[in-house]
Amino acid sequence: RWECYRLNKYSSFEKIKNRLESKIDRDEYQTLSVELGDLKALLNTESNTHFINLINQLILLIESIILNKKYSKTNESLGKLIEAIKITTPTFSLDNYKNFAYSSMELRILMDIALLDNKIKFTEKSLEIMEFCIKTVDPNEELYPKICYNLSYTYHRLDMDKNALKYSNLGIEYCTKHRNYNGLNLLYFRKGIAEYLLGYKTYMDSLEKCIHFCEILSQYKLRDMVITNCKKLYDIDIC
């Protein structure tokens, strides 16, 4: 009976986590307070230290996302992420991060740290952390294509288009292999832009697939943004 109770609670945690990731994939940040409230309610019924740590890390991740996306408080957002990793790795810092082994949750947070560092000052540190994440993550984990996408974008910002293409392709391969279509639209967008900048004729096929998967996933706002940005930034007419 106790094991069944614990499995049910972990299942509830996973459902909240999956809802969160789904909202992030769709750029739906306005209602993250729902997941935040559900996690805090779950926390009040928990006594297992490991599980409490997991919940608190996810709470801090959500708080970080809200600070960044809703209030544009990037430094405070970064502070929340560092605090989250320190729950399980108390001596963690951006200078010694390579010294530790990380859980999937911690790698997810570390990836967001790299993204925020990229946004705040765009140094080589953000690329270095993202490369560490891709080398560390299990290539069969759901986190893998997210890191591929973000690494592709980071390389794009550095005008390293062949690397941007490489990691968008790796992310697409994962999604195809595991039949996980969330994020395929974004990966095909990165692939298409990299191909365009490299002078490859296949870029339009990739961008059309991006639009196709936006529609399959009912992400019409993202579809329209892709079409607008392609025209505005690259003079590419998709539709």
Task: For the regions a language model picked out, list residue spans one by one.
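Structural motif corresponding to the intra-repeat A-B loop/turn of tetratricopeptide repeats
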Residues: 26, 70-71, 120, 151, ...
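Long, low-complexity regulatory tails in eukaryotic proteins
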Residues: 165, 169-239
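Flexible inter-repeat linkers and adjacent short helices
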Residues: 1-76, 80
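Residue register of alpha-helical TPR repeats
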Residues: 55-58, 101, 108, 146, ...
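Helix-turn-helix repeat elements of alpha-solenoid scaffolds
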Residues: 24-44, 71-92, 118-131, 159-169, ...
